[in-house]
Structure formats: structure tokens, C-alpha cells
A protein has these predicted regions:
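A glycine-rich, Thr/Ser-enriched phosphate-binding loop motif common to dinucleotide/cofactor-binding enzymes
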Residues: 121-140
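A short, basic/flexible loop-to-alpha-helix module at the beginning of a structural domain
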Residues: 1, 136-146
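Rossmann-like adenosine-cofactor binding region
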Residues: 57, 72-93, 188-264
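NAD(P)-binding Rossmann-fold cofactor-contacting core
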Residues: 26-44, 171-191
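Glycine-rich adenosine-cofactor-binding loop
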Residues: 7-17, 148-168
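N-terminal ligand-binding/catalytic initiation module
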Residues: 1-105, 114, 278, 282-283
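Rossmann-fold NAD(P)-binding glycine/threonine-rich loop
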Residues: 98-115, 237-281
């Protein structure tokens, strides 16, 4: 029988805040690897005084049947997905975000329940809202102009792009949506946005004060960066390596920021509650 009910591994302030929420519901929790920030580490250690803090991933996994990871689940220097794969057993239920497809397939083959937070539409939408708000906050923090009446370009009109565009429009920004999809452009137009075909990005890039990228593909390359306004601020919220050539941006003195994990940075407590509620509803 496992010594603890839930092992919380890796992640950021969101996973740190999940610990006391689990405990409030009567679960014993052991933690490992919540090291994104000193605040998160302190929060986790404080919240599990009555439970435990593992000295290794193996100890955490062996100690509980429910494993809750961060978003993303795998984090260099904190959680190696290959090591986790070697340690988990059929008795485990795994939760985390942006879980590699190969890991999820392996879990399926081994009859291990594996739930990706970001495959749950309600969580993904909640995450997109927090990401959009965080992107706007980053823009305000790093540029000394108003968003009101600013010429703002949003690249991509998926879940994040739609919500971000709408929130910028609500702040009276002059929003243009750029996409390679005619359907996305038509939808953006229907919601009152200006639109720009992706193949015109280089030609029009210099017209904008703020550029928000949501597409995880190398769209903002050196050629596009060369055309940008010298005072532009690029906020890249795309996952993985993002969508900006950061080496070229530095050489061209274009202010570009890759802003990952914004919900964990600015909306950690409410995000943690959302994730906790999902886990508790599925164990």
C-alpha cells in the first residue's frame, strides 16, 4: 500500500499551490522537484509539513499511486520523461500537461492511465485566458506606451489567438489578425478584427507597435524582423522554441520576448484550483 495518496512532481507555482488544495480534501501528498522559483519551492515545502518531500523522483513515484506533474510534464534538469517511464507501474495514474505523444502511447500499451491537462478543452480554454492576460501584462511591463489605440498584430487565430485578440480589442487596441488559414481570417473579420494573410507578413511587419505570436513555427524569421519597426515589442507565447529567430532579433536589436508558462507566473493559484478540481474528479 502506498504511503501517500498523491505525488506532485516538477512544475511551477501552479503545482506548488495544488499541494494544499489536495490536502484540504484529505489527501496525503509527497512532493518532488517543484523548483521553478524560490517562492514555489517555499510554498511547497511549507504546505507539506504534515506529509513529505521526496529526495528523488523514484521515492516520489514509489510513494503514491497518483502522479501529478506540471505543464509541461517534462522539464529539463528537473524531470526526465524517460526516467519517469522506467519508474511508473500499472497501479499509477498520471496527470500533467503537454505530455509527449510517445509517453502517452507507452502508457496506453502498459494499461497505465495518463491524462494530459491540455487535451481537456475546459482546461485548455482556461489556460488560454490566463496566457492572454499574461501576454498583455508582459507587453505593459516591457513597453512604455499604451495598448489603447496601439497597432497590435496577433499571429495565429487558434484558441490563444482568439482570446488574446478579443482582450486586446477590449482595451481599444487596433488589432490585426495574421493567419495562413482563410477560415481563421474570415472568423477574425467576423469578430471585427483587421486581417492579414500570412504571406503578407514580411511586407506589413513594420506597421505594428506590438506583435504577439501564438504559432509554434518559425514565422518571424530574419527577413520579417528586418522589416519591423525599431520600437516594436514582440511577445512570443508559442510553445516549444516559439516562432521567432531570437539570434537574428538580437543582432537586429528587435525587442523579442519568449514568454512561456504565463499562467504559472501570473495566475498560479486559480490555475492550480482548476487543475486540482480536474484531478480530484478523475481519481
Amino acid at each position: 500500500m502506498a504511503e501517500y495518496d498523491i505525488a506532485v512532481i516538477g512544475g511551477d507555482k501552479r503545482t506548488a499551490y495544488m499541494v494544499p488544495f489536495f490536502q484540504e480534501s484529505g489527501y496525503k501528498v509527497i512532493c518532488f522537484g517543484i523548483q521553478e522559483t524560490e517562492e514555489a519551492e517555499m510554498e511547497a515545502k511549507h504546505s507539506i509539513e504534515a506529509d513529505g518531500y521526496a529526495g528523488s523522483l523514484r521515492e516520489a513515484v514509489d510513494s503514491a499511486d497518483v502522479i501529478v506533474g506540471g505543464i509541461p510534464l517534462e522539464k529539463k534538469g528537473v524531470l526526465d520523461i524517460r526516467e519517469l517511464s522506467r519508474l511508473i507501474r500499472k497501479r499509477h495514474t498520471i496527470f500533467g500537461g503537454v505530455i509527449p505523444e510517445t509517453f502517452r502511447q507507452e502508457c496506453g500499451e502498459r494499461n497505465i492511465v495518463c491524462c494530459d491537462f491540455m487535451q481537456v478543452e475546459s482546461i485548455a480554454v482556461f489556460n488560454a485566458v490566463a496566457t492572454a492576460e499574461g501576454a498583455i501584462l508582459e507587453a505593459l511591463r516591457h513597453k512604455d506606451t499604451n495598448i489603447h489605440r496601439s497597432k497590435s498584430l496577433v499571429i495565429g487565430y487558434g484558441r490563444c489567438g482568439k482570446i488574446l485578440s478579443d482582450k486586446l480589442k477590449g482595451l481599444s487596441a487596433l488589432v490585426t489578425v495574421c493567419s495562413g488559414s482563410q477560415t481563421e481570417l474570415a472568423l477574425a473579420d467576423a469578430y471585427g478584427m483587421q486581417t492579414l494573410a500570412l504571406d503578407q507578413l514580411g511586407e506589413k511587419a513594420g506597421e505594428y507597435e506590438y506583435v504577439y505570436n501564438t504559432v509554434p513555427a518559425p514565422l518571424i524569421d530574419e527577413a520579417v524582423l528586418q522589416k519591423m519597426n525599431k520600437d516594436v515589442l514582440v511577445i512570443d507565447i508559442a510553445s516549444g522554441k516559439g516562432g521567432v529567430d531570437y539570434k537574428a532579433a538580437k543582432e537586429l536589436s528587435v525587442h523579442a520576448l519568449h514568454c512561456l508558462g504565463l499562467p504559472g507566473k501570473y495566475a498560479c493559484r486559480i490555475s492550480a484550483r482548476c487543475l486540482t478540481d480536474y484531478v480530484l474528479g478523475h481519481i
